[in-house]
Regions:
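Hydrophobic cores of alpha-helical transmembrane segments in multi-pass inner/ER membrane proteins
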Residues: 34-44, 128-132
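Hydrophobic/aromatic-rich structural module bridging two neighboring secondary-structure elements via a short loop
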Residues: 50-81
Length: 189
């Protein structure tokens, strides 16, 4: 199914050109759609790996898609803010032409340095809040039995936050996935 969905983008220049122009003109809409589809697909595959099924009662694929879409718009906003702001800050701190270096076509050590600085800054400031909020929304969806009603039911923040496994959140999610996966991943992308 995934191959069928993506195949037209590889076979038709017209379809791919339309995608690129729509993405450029409607970045937030596309962020919502891409994250709703691809991130939810990742969660479904994760469930398949961990539980042997693609869906189960209470999992809430539709609410997860909506939440991922909203989170995707936040991620898009963060990428714009940090990719513009960090090079400006680097120039303020003394690196000449950091913004122009980052947006140039040419690959250079300075460009990699700017990309790494953007990634480290974004993932240090934004990612912990984002990941915690995502964990809260996932827990809320599960508490609502995976129902679409979870999208309009107030989130019991205190109950969920105090019930989070902070040992895992700190020692694995923050201390391992952010520096060892997200720093390099966002430096490359």
């Amino acid at each position: 199914l995934v191959v069928v969905v993506f195949l037209p983008f590889f076979l038709s220049d017209a379809v791919y050109d339309w995608y690129k122009s729509f993405n450029a003109a409607h970045g937030m809409v596309m962020s919502f759609l891409k994250f709703a589809i691809l991130s939810s697909l990742g969660e479904v595959l994760g469930l398949r790996i961990s539980a042997g099924v693609y869906n189960r009662k209470g999992f809430g694929i539709i609410p997860r898609m909506v939440v991922w879409g909203i989170l995707g718009m936040g991620i898009n906003a963060a990428m714009i803010i940090f990719s513009k702001g960090v090079p400006q800050f680097m120039e303020y701190m003394g690196m000449a032409n950091a913004a122009a270096t980052f947006t140039s076509e040419a690959m250079s050590l300075d460009k990699v340095l700017v990309a790494l600085a953007i990634s480290v800054t974004m993932n240090t400031i934004f990612a912990p809040v984002f990941m915690t909020f995502h964990k809260i929304t996932d827990t809320h969806i599960l508490m609502c039995g995976g129902s679409i009603k979870s999208l309009i039911t107030p989130i019991p923040m205190t109950k969920i936050i105090t019930g989070l496994n902070w040992n895992v959140q700190w020692n694995f999610v923050f201390k391992k996935t952010i520096p060892f996966f997200w720093y390099p991943a966002h430096t490359i992308t």
